[in-house]
Amino acid sequence: MYEWKLNEIVDSGVCARCGTCTIVCPNGILTFDERPKLIDECLRKGHGMCFEVCPRVSSAKYQIKIREKFYEKYYYAKSDIEGQDGGVVTAFLKYLLENGKIDGAIVVGDECWKPVSLVVQNAEDLLKTAKSKYAISTLDALRKAGEMGLEKVAVVGLPCQINGLRKLQYFPYHAKHDLELGRNGKPVKLPKIEYLIGLFCTEKFRYDNMKEVLSKHGIDIEKVEKFDIKKGKLLVYVNGEKKEFDLKEFEICSGCKMCRDFDAEMADVSVGCVGSPDGYSTIIIRTEKGEEIKNAVELKEGVNLEEIEKLRQLKLKRFKKEVERRRENNEYVSFYWTADYGGIGKRADGTYFIRVRAKPGGWYKPEEIKEILDIAEEYNAKIKVTDRAGYELHGISGFDVEDIVLRLREKGLLTGSEGPLVRATLACPGGGNCSSGLVDTTELARIIEDNFKERPAPYKFKIAISGCPNGCVRPQVHDIGIAGVKYPKVNEEKCNGCGRCAEVCKVEAIDIRGETSYTNYNVCVGCGKCIKNCPNEAREVKEEGYLVYVGGKTGREVVEGVKMKLMSVDEIINFIDKVLVVYGKYAEKPQRERLAAVMKRVGYGKFLEEVKELMKKEIC
């Protein structure tokens, strides 16, 4: 047996048997026969892409969800194509093929009902695969499609397979690097997955076990015409007759007990029979690409949502029961579902931390702090205050992460601000709290949070607001930095040259000549102290507002941001939005290139000019 990092997942029975790991290995040394297996020595011992796409290592759902912006629209339909429960999936794939949306479809065919992964490129071959198989299947055909030179495909898969393929689509965002290179210096060749079509699934069965059980009842699996699952029964159609079997007679894949996804939550469109009339399929549209199914079949409203929710809860109940069983028996659990939520990270000691996204300006209500303290005491956790005024609970068991996250939500405390997204806005106390504050930093932080909270970005994206040019929160070295400023002018009729303004000016930008004070605007930083301290009200406001910096950073390299002109609140929101758009356009290496690096590579002038043009279009 070769050393392989995924052995713990596979051998412990946590493996979903989705087959995603086998298709991404650039060296082709993984095979799949109802479970993945390493057939040759791996130079990195499995510390690579096979591990990083595994949906049982981490779901990566949160990072995927904020990028796909999933929603749910429920319909039911049937087509004029003979297939499982109305042939909806077949009809959709037929539409995509005939309209050039895809070059091929990755579907499951069968050899005597043993699932076989197939590449289908025409409607005629598609019809031959139009019935459900309930045994463990693979995704081998996706790799074959790449070798055939196909560029765009749709994939039909079970919830676990959809999860693995979504992780493949967004690989750099959660793995923090590009695809693994093989011994030939190249990554695996795969087509672009344009559409993910998910199938409802409660469990899947071992093929050999299905064959054996049916044989005991005098049924030759080779003569079965159709399988279906309804109300806890496996329906087997042979010679025009329907026979029912209790699902408990069949051995389900052990990893299915660790699954909590009934309806393929990360698919573009999910399809199944639950919740719709006989002969129809329920359709859940989740993305804009999923909306295209409307061009293939006529959709009807009126899905029985209670039936779907019942199956969701049954699967979740089974999952929780299995997790608890493993906990009691000290068996391996991967805690893959903790990645369903933002702000969760694994510590060096194997426990977890939960980051509470900082409230706007770092201001908390007493009851919010009390809740954090109560949780820390109850779960024996340590508390860390982050440099962005957030709270982290450390030393949390993986078994408790989800319960704590949901409990925090009930108190209005959002977990997040971790990964390639807009982090919590850092702000000093600001005007009304600090004697030097010129602007209300808390209100501006709230507006920014309302517009950009957890917005996805190529890499972490940090914003800081300082109430004055003192810059105690270092706005110059943030992706976006904002500082309140107030520049003075002199009312010569009121000025008597007393010199008080020059005394309070920390940058020595003021000279007194006779009975008048003069400001050197090349030195003045706009702190407004001279205006505030003039006993004769001779210092007035020449210009005030928000000074903005863009493209700063700290870390391995310190970069000071480019200073922009003064902006209003509306202009700041427009500016941040367009900076994120242009950043996303030019970033080539997700999780590797901060905004500063992209601006430098593209050219500061070109980058900012494009931002300005987009801002103008917004205004128009």
Swiss-Prot record:
Identify which cofactors the protein needs according to its UniProt entry: [4Fe-4S] cluster; siroheme
Reaction catalysis annotation: 3 oxidized coenzyme F420-(gamma-L-Glu)(n) + hydrogen sulfide + 3 H2O + 2 H(+) = 3 reduced coenzyme F420-(gamma-L-Glu)(n) + sulfite
Q: Which residues bind [4Fe-4S] cluster 2?
A: C428, C434, C468, C472
Please list the residues that bind [4Fe-4S] cluster 4: C524, C527, C530, C534
Keyword set includes Repeat: yes
Give the GO molecular function terms: 4 iron, 4 sulfur cluster binding; heme binding; metal ion binding; oxidoreductase activity, acting on CH or CH2 groups, with an iron-sulfur protein as acceptor
Task: Copy out the cofactor comment.
Answer: Binds 4 [4Fe-4S] cluster.
Q: List ligand-binding residues for siroheme.
A: C472
According to the record, how does pH govern the activity? Optimum pH is 7.0.
Q: What induces it?
A: Induced by sulfite.
A Pfam short name: NIR_SIR_ferr
Cite the InterPro entries for this sequence.
4Fe4S_Fe-S-bd, 4Fe4S_Fe_S_CS, Co_F420_Hydgase/DH_bsu_N, FRHB/FDHB/HCAR-like, FrhB_FdhB_C, NiRdtase/SiRdtase_haem-b_fer, Nit/Sulf_reduc_fer-like_dom_sf, NO2/SO3_Rdtase_4Fe4S_dom
Q: Which UniProt keywords apply?
A: 4Fe-4S, Heme, Iron, Iron-sulfur, Metal-binding, Oxidoreductase, Repeat
The record's note on activity versus temperature states: Optimum temperature is above 95 degrees Celsius.
Cite the binding residues for [4Fe-4S] cluster 1. Answer: C15, C18, C21, C25
Q: Which residues bind [4Fe-4S] cluster 3?
A: C495, C498, C501, C505
Q: What is its EC number?
A: 1.8.98.3
Summarizing the function annotation, the protein's role is: Catalyzes the reduction of sulfite to sulfide using reduced F420 as the electron source. Involved in sulfite detoxification and assimilation. Cannot use NADH or NADPH.
Other remarks in the entry? Expression in Methanococcus maripaludis, a sulfite-sensitive methanogen, leads to sulfite detoxification and use of sulfite as a sole sulfur source by M.maripaludis.
What the entry lists under PANTHER family is as follows: 7-HYDROXYMETHYL CHLOROPHYLL A REDUCTASE, CHLOROPLASTIC
Family, according to the entry, reads as follows: Belongs to the nitrite and sulfite reductase 4Fe-4S domain family.
- Protein known as: Coenzyme F420-dependent sulfite reductase
Q: Which organism is it from?
A: Methanocaldococcus jannaschii (strain ATCC 43067 / DSM 2661 / JAL-1 / JCM 10045 / NBRC 100440)
Which lineage is the organism of this entry classified under, starting from the top rank? Archaea, Methanobacteriati, Methanobacteriota, Methanomada group, Methanococci
